[in-house]
Regions:
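Hydrophobic pocket/interface hotspot
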Residues: 23, 31, 51, 55, ...
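Short, low-complexity N-terminal intrinsically disordered segments enriched in polar/charged residues
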Residues: 1-29
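Short, ordered coil/turn segments that flank beta-strands lining enzyme active or ligand-binding pockets
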Residues: 29, 95, 110
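Short beta-strand segments that buttress and anchor functional surface loops
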Residues: 87-95
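Short solvent-exposed loop/turn micro-motifs enriched in small/polar/acidic residues
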Residues: 6, 70-72, 98-100
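Short beta-strand edge/turn micro-motifs at domain boundaries
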Residues: 85, 99-124
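A solvent-exposed, acidic/Ser-Thr-rich amphipathic alpha-helical stretch
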Residues: 2, 28-80
């Protein structure tokens, strides 16, 4: 399986299932994650996390605060992979109502791990 498809499938499944061990295994040791939720969840000034320890703390705390209705984890099965870049969307409209519109943007390293992960939010 191509690395982009592997990340697309495995990241989504692990996130839905709150499997933080499986999630962090998809990231390179020196990965960066940027999200507007970082300051809210971790009480930091910056929205950028670096390395497994910081990213795992965010994933664990974020997972423990669910469930909520902002994300229904609906995707339409489409993603864009160009070289080492991977992009997909959780669209606003779902078959069961609406969810927050999220765009996942990831850069993969030579080993197929997530090197940089940026999360962009729409409105909710």
């Amino acid at each position: 399986m191509e690395p982009a498809r592997h990340i697309y499938e495995q990241w989504h499944q692990a996130a839905k299932n709150r499997d933080t061990a499986a999630l962090i295994a998809l990231y390179a040791d020196d990965a960066e994650l940027e999200s507007p939720l970082v300051p809210v969840i971790l009480g930091r000034d910056s929205g950028i996390l670096r390395g497994h320890a910081e990213i795992l703390a965010f994933l664990e705390e974020g997972s423990s605060r669910r469930p909520n209705e902002l994300v229904r984890w609906y995707r339409d099965g489409r993603y864009l992979a160009a070289g080492k870049l991977l992009v997909w969307e959780y669209p606003r409209q779902t078959p069961d109502g609406s969810q927050v519109d999220i765009l996942e943007l990831m850069e993969l390293d030579d080993d197929g791990k997530i090197r940089r992960h940026r999360i962009y939010w729409g409105w909710f």
